[in-house]
């Protein structure tokens, strides 16, 4: 996704009220962020930073290293790009305060081949075990990306099989209808009825700054103007001081 400099400049004057504290689970609970690619965590980045700041142990799990790109770098598809993106993921996770960043190593764009044999579920399930909360894409995958949808579906499959005493809260990140950033690149992103987005994680200016630092890590995926302005754009439009989630159950 690329965001034009003009759109970023147009939104620069917007101001956003920030809640004093972030909403989270009990201190020191485990939170797992299950997504498909390095950079997917950006769409809930200040929420991750808020949870980590409050003392939750956050693990970010990427199903693939993003070896297919395409991004904005000169790297061809393959292991060289994957290696750089793993480093970008670690940089981003560190900026957000995550305790652990894990890559499951499946091929970018090839997750469908690991659903029927159960290998994706088997690889992801141990990371979900013991978590109090799991954050992931909604069924829409943000903008319909097949890998995003599959990670959401497999994560849901894992969580719904757990008994009540072992089942973590499962939250789908969502964009409330009417709050999409006014950029052409996001015109086709899925939105959710605000009435369903009943869980929010509020963040502070420091958490947003951490999110901005995380975005700067993903050099292969976004031009500099987008990396510099993406979090501010999201803050001014679809977040406004808190990231919105739809409880799965």
List the predicted regions and their residue ranges.
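Metal-dependent de-N-acetylase/amidase catalytic core
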Residues: 18-34, 54, 115-249
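Bacterial N-terminal signal peptides
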Residues: 6-15
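Functionally engaged cysteine thiol sites
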Residues: 7, 70, 148
